[in-house]
Each structure stands twice: as C-alpha cells, then as structure tokens.
Amino acid sequence: MRATNGPIISASESKRATEGRRSSALRATVFWLCASRCAIAYADGPLNYFLHADGPAATPTMRLGWALTALVAAVALIVTALLVGAILRRRPLAAERDAQHLQAEGGGMHWVWIGTGISSVALFAALAYVLVTLEAVAEPGRAPRLTITVTAYDWWWKVDYPSGATTANEIHIPVGEPVRVELQSADVVHAFWVPRLAGKTQTIPGVINEQWIEADHPGVYRGQCSQFCGAQHAHMAFEVIAEPRAQFDAWLENQGQPRAALSADATLQAGAQLFQERCAGCHSVRGTDAVGKQAPDLTHLGSRRLIAAGALLNTAANQLDWIQHAQRIKPDSLMPSIALTSADATALCAYLQTLR
C-alpha cells in the first residue's frame, strides 16, 4: 500500500468544490455587472448634478464639486500610503539597536509641520474657490427679463407668470436667458431644486426667497423638492422646459387665455357639469365658475407633460386613474379618490381633454 500525506478527497467533493468556485465567480460577475449598470444609469439620471450641468448657475457648482472631490481623494490616498508604509516598515528591535550601537529614530516632527502647512494651504485654497463659486452663482451675468413666482404646496408647485398665466408643476423658460424665480411656501418648508440648472433654495412660509435659472440648451429638466416635507415628499417633482424665445412667447400667450368655448356635445356638457359639481371646490378653470384655490389650475391641463406633480404621464387613462385612485397613487395628498360611474368617468375624461 502507498501512504498518503493528506486526506483523500473524493470525486464528488472535488466536483462540489469546483462548482462552488464557479458559482462564486458567477455571483461576482453578476454583482459587478449590476453595479456598473447602476453607475451608468445614475450618470444619465435627470438629478445627476455631479456629471452634468446645463446652465451658468449650475456649472460653477459642478466644477467646485469636482475640485473638492479631487482634494479629498488626494488626502485619502496620501494618508493611506503613509499608513500602509508605517505598517509594512520594519524597525530594528531594541536589542538589535544596542548590539549595532544604533540610535533610536526620531525627528519625525518636521513631517508633522510639513503636513500641517500643506493641509492649511489646501484648505485655504478650497475656501477661496468656494467663495469665488458663490459669487459666480449669486447673480446672473445680465438682468433677467422675466420673473416668475413659484409657490410650494403639499405636494405640488404653483407657477405664476406676470402676464397672468398660471401652471402647475411645469415651468417654461426661454433658452439662453436668465429667469428670476421668487419662491414662497403655502404650508411647510420645501426646497426648490433643478440640479442641472441651479442649486437648492428653500421655500419658507412667510418668506420670499429668490433664485435664478438659465438653460444653455433647449430641453426638459427635472426639478425636485429636496427638503423633506411629509409623506409624499419624494413625489413632489416638476419640470423646467427650456425652449426658443418665439416658442416660449407663443406658449405663454396661450397659457394666458381662458378656457376655449365648449361645444354643445352632450358628453362634454355633462363632463363640464360634473367637474363643476365635484372638482370646482378645489380646482380652477379660468373662464368658468370653477375658481378653487386649494389645488392646481387646470385651465390648460392638456398642454402639460405630467400630472400629479410628476407621478404620472398626462394621458387620458392616467387622468382617470388619478381622479379615481388618488389616495392609492399619492397617499395623504389633499386629492381624494372620487368614485365615478362608467358614464361619469367617460364624460369627465372627455371634458378634461378639451382643456388645452
């Protein structure tokens, strides 16, 4: 018989070990693929202000973020390198020093002073850069031609233009022009934030704060309340739509008009009557007897991309879903879930589609 130097591993155990290694490798691969996909998705996300800036009020802040991140990364790398070097370095023992007549190491304080000096210079440079950035975003380069008022409610945004136009959760601005935004709150503290266009500004009850935004390119920019304000804080979004001046002027003129005349169609008339009975206490439609002030103005509802403060796309089906199941979609919002018969739902939906 031949002696062995270790335990005998059966074929089945060897197979299980191989499968275990393959499974671990597969899990690691899946993890890194998922992590990479998440990183790519975040990089392209509408709220990513670290990699994207599309306006002069956001670009300096983005660059400041890069600079501070680079500074922190450099400090972390230097400290880590020094720490690893100190751990790996072998110093002679006391007995070895005595045998070789070596003196104990010392004189390390000069490194402390060097590190303190470099850190002080870096921190003061960072402070100076922060002050320069604050100055750059405090005021636009030229006086704004347009000032709008944005009022925050639980959990939606009212937008008023000087011409008398009123929208909800949707701000239109001319591209390439600074726009001053006056911010106020009707209930609690919120925060107005369009990451790719500007920084955050709080809306405080009884106080009017100001901010300015400007878009370098036409497009749709996501905005979000960034101050926790209750159960539906995460669903308190809005959009800033930047468009050429001529297109903006046409939009603004249309938004200032009252509701278009309603045809004599029986379904539309029934829908208008139902709206007056069930919705007019909170909502308003200019040009009608609906003058509610507690909820969004719906005069031009059909022209908006989203409803429910960004929770749903503005389609006929989603409008009806929102009306009938508001408390399921946004629990604790002031919008109640309204029970409707099939005929009433059809009539109300048809009426809402005319509000453009």
Go through the PLM ranges and name each one:
Residues 250, 269-280, 296-299, 317, ...:
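Solvent-exposed, polar/charged alpha-helical surfaces in well-ordered, non-transmembrane soluble domains
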Residues 251-267, 281-296, 300:
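Accessory recognition modules or surfaces
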Residues 164-167, 246-276:
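Electrostatic cytochrome c docking/interface patches
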Residues 247-253, 318, 322-356:
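C-terminal capping alpha-helices of c-type cytochrome domains
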Residues 226-235, 272-297, 304-309, 324-333, ...:
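Periplasmic/extracellular electron-transfer cofactor-ligation site
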Residues 2-5, 13-15, 20-22, 26-175:
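Extracytoplasmic entry segments of secretory-pathway proteins
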